[in-house]
Amino acid sequence: MKKRVVIVVGVLVLLIVLLTLIICFKPREVKDLNLAENIAMKIKEGSLTNTGATVIITDLSGNENLDLINKKFKIDYKKNNKWYRLESKIKNEVIVSTSDNDVDNGNNTYTQEINWERYYGKLDKGHYRIVKEVKTDLYIAAEFDI
C-alpha cells in the first residue's frame, strides 16, 4: 500500500513538472501592433543576413514626440499566420538594443544597423519582423524572410 502511494505521488509530481515546463516554454503570441501612421521602416537592400540588417526609417508624420532612432528592438516570427516573440538568449535580458551605428540622412530618413546575433543567435529560415517602439504602445515594423 505504501509503495503504491509513493508511485502515485511520484507520477503526480512528474505530471506537474511537465505541465509547468510546457507552460513556461510555450511561445508567446504577440498581440496586434498599434503601428504608427506615416512612418515606414524597411530593410536596406543587400544588408540582410541571418545575424543582422540595416533598416531605413522614413518619417512623414511630422510628430516630433517620437523616438525613431532609439536603440531598442524586438524580433517576432510568424508561424501559422500568428506572430510570436522571439526570446532573447541572454537570461533576464529585458531590453535588446542596437549598436550606435545610426545615421540621420536628412529628409526625415534615418539608417540604423541592427545586429541581433548577441540576443537571438543566427536566425533560422522563416518569416520575421523587426519591431521598434517609437512611443508608448506605438510601433514601427519591417518584415523579412531568411
Explain the meaning of each model-derived region.
Residues 89-127, 133:
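Short, solvent-exposed, Trp/other aromatic-anchored flexible loops in extracytoplasmic proteins
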Residues 7-8, 12-90, 133-146:
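Primarily secretory-pathway and cell-envelope proteins
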Residues 77, 84, 110, 119-120, ...:
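Sequence-level detector for tyrosine residue identity
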Residues 1-4:
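Positively charged n-region of N-terminal signal peptides that target proteins for export
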